[in-house]
Amino acid sequence: MAGFSGKKHIVSALMRRYTDRVPVTILIGPYCSRLTKYSVKEILQDAKKSTEAHLAFYDRFAPDSVIIYNDIYLEVEALGCELEFPENDISHPRTVLLDEKSRLARLKVPDPKRDGRIPYFIEVCERVSAQVRKTTALGLGHSGPWNIAMHLR
């Protein structure tokens, strides 16, 4: 299967078609920062630095897919939860957003164009995709409803 790109390996496997090897992907998360001069904190707050770190990971390991998954607290931050950003570890909530049940009714649906770091995450996805989408499958990760509910309390 000469000339088979990582993307073709992933798509073939998902469609249950022949591929000459098992596709490989690695969920590295924010620790791709270690392949650059940036700290985890920097790539969690700067789309250009995060893009550079994800592309450094792609260039070094050539996975069949790149998964952009920086932070499990992205959604709760957009809802108003204040986060702490250690220099070389993932962020975590500084306070509990729903310390009182009555606050639940006051939550607003976040605007992905302006709330929290959702605009940053969209920018990272667009920047990385522009560089690798022709040869590599691209995925992204985010928290689902149960994780979000747990992180709010």
Model-derived segments and spans:
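N-terminal basic, low-complexity leaders that serve as flexible interaction/assembly modules and, when applicable
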Residues: 1-87, 126-127
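Active-site-proximal, glycine-rich beta->alpha crossover segments in alpha/beta enzymes
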Residues: 80-153
